């Protein structure tokens, strides 16, 4: 039975119109996928354009008040870094110095609090973990609130899951279409992680 089915399929596939249909369907699928991807890219770029008028919307973001705000001995952290990790209190440390509770070991000399190393004055950094740590500084609250007020409507879908200062910094420091100059080129390939209101400075190409 299997041999018979195999022979029938081979005969069908030898017919040119069958191959034409298969090719046509493949082409339609490819074009549809390409257009959808382009549509998503354009939509993201439009969302990341900051509005000109302040929006007085209520946000769930709660800002750190320093070490006293810790209510448990557990920490969330930036997770993804191979070499560095930033916890939700603003400490940045080497991954090997991360404790079992998710917090950086503050008794190690290399662990730093609210470090802006690799960051430029405009709030763009070359290392993601330093961007998050710098963004968590309490004195960045006004800057972040200003960004949220201006971008609240455009970012309501992108930031709907953000609940506090740490999650906001994680999301803000990720590279986005704001960091892109052309399709595959960063505006500033050195400092592409930004917590500030403005995108990276445009470098000549």
UniProtKB/Swiss-Prot annotation:
Alphabetical keyword list: Glycoprotein, Golgi apparatus, Membrane, Transmembrane, Transmembrane helix
Annotated glycan sites: 67
Gene Ontology cellular-component terms listed: Golgi membrane
Predominant location: Golgi
Name used for this protein in its record: SREBP regulating gene protein
Lumenal topological intervals: 36-205
Similarity field: Belongs to the SPRING family.
Pfam families: SPRING1 (PF10218)
GO BP term, example: positive regulation of SREBP signaling pathway
Keyword presence, Transmembrane helix: yes
Membrane-crossing segments per the record: 17-35
InterPro entries in the cross-refs: SPRING1
Matching PANTHER family: SREBP REGULATING GENE PROTEIN
Domain of life: Eukaryota
Localisation per UniProt entry: Golgi apparatus membrane
Organism: Xenopus laevis (African clawed frog)
Coiled coil: none
Cystine connections: none
UniProt entry tagged with the keyword Kinase: no
Cytoplasmic side: 1-16
Function, as annotated: Positively regulates hepatic SREBP signaling pathway by modulating the proper localization of SCAP (SREBP cleavage-activating protein) to the endoplasmic reticulum, thereby controlling the level of functional SCAP.
Membrane topology: Single-pass membrane protein
The organism's taxonomic lineage, starting at the top: Eukaryota, Metazoa, Chordata, Craniata, Vertebrata
């Amino acid at each position: 039975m299997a041999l018979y089915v195999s022979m029938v399929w081979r005969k069908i596939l030898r017919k040119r119109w069958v191959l034409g249909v298969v090719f046509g369907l493949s082409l339609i699928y490819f074009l549809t996928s390409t257009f959808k991807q382009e549509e998503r890219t354009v939509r993201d770029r439009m969302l990341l354009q900051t509005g000109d008028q302040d929006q007085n919307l209520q946000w769930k973001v709660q800002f750190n008040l320093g070490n006293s705000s810790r209510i448990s001995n557990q920490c969330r952290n930036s997770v993804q870094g191979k070499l560095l990790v930033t916890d939700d209190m603003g400490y940045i440390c080497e991954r090997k110095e991360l404790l079992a509770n998710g917090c950086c070991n503050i008794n190690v000399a290399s662990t730093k609090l609210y470090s802006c190393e690799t960051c430029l004055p405009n709030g763009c950094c070359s290392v993601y973990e330093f961007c998050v740590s710098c963004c968590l500084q309490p004195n960045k609250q006004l800057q972040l609130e200003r960004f949220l007020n201006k971008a609240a409507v455009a970012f309501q879908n992108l930031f709907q899951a953000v609940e506090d200062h740490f999650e906001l910094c994680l999301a803000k420091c990720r590279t986005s279409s704001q960091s892109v100059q052309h399709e595959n080129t960063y505006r500033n390939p050195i400092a592409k992680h930004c917590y500030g209101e403005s995108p990276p400075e445009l470098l000549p190409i």
